[in-house]
Design a protein with these regions (language model features):
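SF2 helicase catalytic motif II
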Residues: 101-104, 112-149, 154
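The feature captures the C-terminal accessory region of ATP-dependent helicases
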Residues: 45-48, 353-607
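Conserved strand-helix element at the start of the C-terminal RecA-like helicase core
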Residues: 51-65, 98-100, 202-232
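Inter-Walker segment of RecA-like/P-loop motor cores
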Residues: 71-109, 251-258
Length: 607
């Protein structure tokens, strides 16, 4: 796809940049990459001298524009066909309709009944187009109007953070990308805190903002938000989330939960992902907020924030007022990481998709060949539950956005394997001046919490071994002292499986326990083998041999039990657990046995 660059000077809005390319309005068949949020793309289309249908990802965005413009028809779940028809019949020069993807078909049906060809008479703008890729895994309906979109004579997609899209129609219809290029330094400061003591770092950050009058926290788990409110005893708060989540929070006693933005904002405001993009937050009482983004991989992978899209969109929610440059005081991302997270390549995803298709074809063939209604019914049920079904659009065809979503997820997962990966992703995004504060501890509060939550002994052993190995690694690399090493080991002592596991770990090491699959029976066998080998080496060491040699006079008859006891004492003092028998005595000395008394004459030491 060809990319055309449009220069944007400081203080200018989107129409100025487009005019430099010779456009008075957003041109057709383009993906408009704004680079920056808040350039007025939606307003540009609302004010354009043509009929427009603007597809927005979420309702709050639409409601926000309704407060600014009185000529818009909002179409979403609550909207009736009657209202749409009434609006389309109005004698207005330019009609402006904003809709969610799910409600687009209401417009199509209403227009058809009125004999209006929307594909010829309206311009279609798909706003925040990256959401078609990002959200389709849990919201398949977000791409519902995509076939309609490509049917429009005039259309465009727009976002400050568009993702690459593989749909063949972009190529077939000759789409170009218009890239807005600001000719000034537009980067914003961002502090990235990477931690394995999640709550501790949040509390420290909030304590550092005790004088802040407005704090806005973006976190995509409502239960996690409720936990923060409860655990940190936050009283002056508001939570903005879906209607379903708001009801759930209210049942839990989190009463200030809303599905739409309500003003004034509280001192501490929480936002879930439906408020990450497109929405304009303008009324914050002249007080610039401090923004905190949270990623807690202990809770869920969907708390990951993409530095290339969501982080940019989040900071862009707060709109300029007048000539002010900064719209917030500070921007912080507090995140955990997971070095063990699996990241699949594009090729591996391709193999998976191919197998999904083959699985479907196999079952479909069985269904077609089944000679029994019950068999057909059973196979039909299995067909509906195949992963393949998640890849289909409403026409039963493979949805390219579903494939893009699989690849996009792996891209973001890769950032969260390490603090460095996440930092570099933010650097490459180009929007932020990033300060990395990696406060990962050798053993953090999150590590202890995982251990305490592990219910199975085998799971506890696995986590203990991982922590012990990490402690040793930090000590070997000089990151902690011996005293700190012992302190971290002590932190693990309260875990039921600790003593057993550390005894085994100190003897046979991590690799042997891993190869035993953390199973007690196999670990015990390996420990016994180790002890036996260790005892043998100690018994035959020059130190032990010398101690035994010096313990007995030669050429005197000595009671066998006395000899055995002395050797046992030497063994015990040196950590040797082997039994002592007459053969043990004979292994060290040439002996002559007395025929009358239970004794040996030690003739010669063998070594």
């Amino acid at each position: 796809m060809q990319t055309i660059k449009a220069i944007l000077n400081k203080g200018e809005w989107l129409p100025k940049a487009l005019k430099r390319l010779g456009y008075d309005m957003i041109p057709s068949n383009c993906i408009l990459d704004k680079t920056l949020t808040g350039l007025g793309a939606t307003s540009c289309e609302i004010e354009a001298k043509r009929n427009s249908i603007i597809i927005e990802p979420n309702v709050p965005v639409i409601l926000g524009k309704l407060n600014s413009y009185d000529n818009i028809e909002a179409v979403y779940q609550k909207c009736t066909p009657y209202n749409i028809k009434a609006y389309l019949k109005l004698d207005k020069k330019y009609k402006k309709i904003m809709t969610t993807p799910e409600s687009f078909e209401k417009i199509r049906k209403a227009a058809k009944e009125l004999g209006i060809n929307i594909y010829e008479e309206f311009f279609c703008l798909y706003d925040e187009c990256e959401k078609t890729t990002q959200d389709i895994d849990y919201r398949r309906s977000i791409t519902k109007p995509i076939h309609d979109f490509f049917a429009f004579k005039d259309k465009a997609m727009v976002s400050a953070t568009p993702l690459d899209m593989s749909h063949t129609k972009f190529e077939e219809q000759g789409f170009t990308k218009i890239k807005i290029v600001p000719n000034y330094d537009y980067r914003k400061p961002l502090t990235l805190i990477v931690t394995n003591s999640y709550y501790k770092r949040i509390k420290q950050t909030l304590d550092g903002l005790k004088d802040s009058k407005k704090i806005c926290i973006f976190f995509n788990v409502t239960d996690g938000i409720a936990d923060l409110i409860d655990n940190l005893d936050i009283t002056d708060y508001k939570v903005f989330c879906s209607e379903k989540s708001a009801k759930k929070l209210i049942k839990r006693g989190i009463n200030n939960a809303y599905s739409e933005i309500t003003y004034p904002l509280a001192r501490v405001n929480f936002f879930t992902c439906r408020f990450y993009s497109a929405l304009d937050i303008t009324n914050y009482d002249g007080v610039k907020p401090d923004i905190i983004m949270l990623t807690d991989l202990r809770t869920a992978n969907w708390t990951m924030i993409d530095p290339f899209t969501e982080a940019i969109q989040i900071q862009g929610r707060f709109r300029k007022r007048g000539d002010e440059e900064a719209t917030y005081n500070s921007l912080t991302h507090i995140s955990t990481i997971n070095p063990d997270i699996k990241v699949r390549s594009k090729e591996e995803i391709g193999i998976k998709v191919e197998q999904f298709i083959k699985n479907h074809e196999t079952l479909q063939k069985q269904h077609n060949n089944a000679n029994n209604d019950m068999k057909k019914e059973a196979i039909s049920e299995d067909l509906k539950n195949l992963k393949y079904e998640d890849l289909l659009d409403d026409k039963g065809e493979i949805n390219p956005f579903a494939i893009d979503n699989l690849q996009n997820e792996e891209r973001v997962h890769a950032y969260y394997k390490s603090a460095e990966n996440l930092y570099q992703a933010y650097q490459r995004a180009g929007i932020f001046k990033v300060t990395l504060n990696n406060v990962t501890e050798c053993v953090g509060e999150d590590d202890i919490e995982r251990l305490n939550q592990a219910k199975l002994a085998i799971e506890q052993r696995k986590l203990i071994v991982e922590n012990l190995a990490n402690i040793d690694k930090w000590f070997t690399n000089g990151r902690i002292s011996f005293e700190e090493k012992e302190k971290y080991r002590t932190l693990l002592k309260k875990i039921p499986e600790f003593q057993y596991t550390i005894n085994a770990y100190d003897k046979i090491g991590k690799d042997a326990i891993v190869s035993a699959e953390y199973k007690k029976k196999i670990i015990d066998r390996k420990v016994r083998e180790f002890d036996k080998s260790e005892d043998y080496q100690k018994r035959n060491s020059s130190e032990i041999k010398n101690l035994i040699k010096e313990a007995f006079p030669l050429n005197e008859y000595l009671n066998k039990n006395i000899i055995k006891q002395k050797i046992m004492d030497i063994y015990y003092q040196n950590g040797i657990m082997s039994k002592v028998t007459q053969n043990t005595i004979k292994s060290y000395f040439e002996c002559k046995e007395s025929g009358k008394i239970n004794s040996f004459k030690l003739i010669k030491f063998k070594y």
